Regions:
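Active-site loop-to-helix "anion-binding N-cap" substructures in soluble metabolic enzymes
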Residues: 1-251
Length: 251
């Protein structure tokens, strides 16, 4: 049986005090978590505190996003890869692609630069998010959108992709809405992604995640999808009891 990865994207749900409390409680579940593959994505301001509090060797910590510049640079509010000691970084989440208030939308070209920087940095693995909006889904454009988003993975990125890159399919219309595609719909999209990856990064071992309203009530149903290697979970992962229930249902 393959090991399923649980990536907990806490977004802005937990402040530093909440994050520390969460990890302290998590440390008490050493036996349950011993054979699990877990990644925590706290807010940038909480990463150091989470790492200092964590005592579980198999739980890694990552950033929710990074700036396109890896070196110190005059970018107000930016966070570079060099500034924080992390194991993973999320790139291209829809909340950075589409929902920035000032409309500085991360386009596909910028996403390509970011994921390449993450993988080329050394020692950091990337989770690259793709997915369609509801309008695109209703127009039957899901594959076209994902094809365009994946296209940036060619070139330099393929040199670093093997065992360092994960693709997370997150339909934008499912994130935080409680609406989840059917297992068949998810499987069809993941199969398409795998097909495209075989062309873009031939021979690379790249995992496939699903994200979008995943919780303790639907995780078992989603686990029936053979193509899924893990889950990128938002709101439910920031609620300790829900998170533990998800972990218990993984195997």
């Amino acid at each position: 049986m393959k090991k399923i990865t649980i990536a907990a994207n806490w977004k802005m749900y937990l402040n530093e005090t909440n994050s520390i409390s969460f990890v302290q409680k998590l440390n008490d579940y050493k036996e349950l978590l011993a054979d699990k593959d877990i990644i925590l994505f706290p807010a940038h301001t909480c990463i150091r505190s989470v790492k200092d509090t964590l005592t579980l060797d198999n739980v890694r910590v990552g950033m929710q996003d990074c700036n396109v510049f890896t070196e110190p640079f005059a970018m107000t509010g930016g966070v570079s890869l060099k500034s924080i000691d992390i194991d993973y970084c999320i790139v291209g989440h829809s909340e950075t692609r589409y929902k920035t208030i000032v409309k500085m939308v991360d386009d596909n070209g910028l996403m390509g630069v970011k994921i390449n920087n993450v993988l080329a940095f050394g020692g950091i693995k990337g989770i690259f998010c793709v997915g369609e909006t509801e309008k695109e889904m209703l127009k039957g454009l899901t594959r076209d959108v994902i094809e365009r988003q994946l296209r940036v993975l060619g070139g330099e990125t393929r040199e670093y992709a093997d065992k360092n890159l994960t693709i997370a399919y997150e339909p934008v219309w499912s994130i935080g809405t409680g609406r989840v595609p059917t297992n068949n719909e998810i499987a069809q999209v993941l199969s398409f992604i795998r097909e495209r990856l075989n062309n873009l990064c031939p021979g690379a071992n790249i995992k496939l995640f699903y994200g979008g309203s995943v919780n303790e009530n639907n995780i078992e149903k989603l686990l029936e999808i053979d193509l899924i290697d893990g889950f990128l979970i938002g709101g439910a992962s920031a609620k300790f009891d829900s998170f533990i229930q998800i972990i218990k249902k993984i195997n």
